[in-house]
Amino acid sequence: VISVNDMRESHFRIGTVGKVIDGVTVKIAEDGEILCKGPNVMMGYYKEEEKTKEVMSGDYFHTGDIGEIDADGFLKITDRKKEMFKTSGGKYIAPQVIENQMKQSLFIEQIMVVGAGRKMPAALIQPNVEYVINWLKEEGVSCTSLAAAVKETKLIEAFQNEIDTHNQHFGSWEQIKKFQLTPEEWTIDEGHLTPTMKLKRKVIKDKYDGLIESMYA
């Protein structure tokens, strides 16, 4: 345990994991990873020097989580380091942060940010089927399937407006410049999602490799 949300003395903030407990020191590495040291942190793995070097920098333990500490001292976890990637320009991208922001749009059911080693991040998007079909109907366009809906120019323009709106929360290097709408829903049964509804990133990347390449063509 390195931090606690405590109801006493207003030491509680929704969306964070609380304030760092006494005796523990937390710092944020250059790539955004949360590092900590204190009496609750191990010295290393028993007789596993190489394994220890992977997770320890001096007295600091690498948590594997990406996060930030706000002005009031509350610690917030925003992503997992293993899901972060670097663009060809050397900028680190935390995809989950961008995805969570974009999913505030009623148009978006699922989204996966890609772009490792590329000049910019881009996104694969699974639209909210019921919402977009109803939206198109109100716009005078009749569609009965997602596959048909994603080809409609009006819908693509609406998604561009949504992306542009939510891009304002990010730096220029993090903004989604290109996106593709997938013609089917992402489901557990089809292998897109885990039983807890998390993205199976490799599966999705492999399945839509053609769409990804088209965004960087």
Predicted regions and their residues:
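Conserved ANL (AMP-binding/adenylate-forming) active-site segment centered on the GW(Y/F)…HTG consensus within
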Residues: 10-17, 41-64, 98-99, 140-150
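Conserved ATP-binding/catalytic segment of the ANL
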Residues: 20-87
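Alpha-helical "lid/cap" subdomains adjacent to substrate-binding clefts that gate access
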Residues: 127-166, 183
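Adenylate-forming
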Residues: 1-6
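Conserved C-terminal "lid"/linker of ANL adenylate-forming enzymes
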Residues: 85, 110-112, 135, 160-217
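C-terminal boundary motif of the adenylate-forming
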Residues: 66, 71, 105-131
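Short Gly/Ser/Thr- and Asp/Glu-enriched loop/turn motifs at secondary-structure junctions
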Residues: 80, 116-120, 174-176
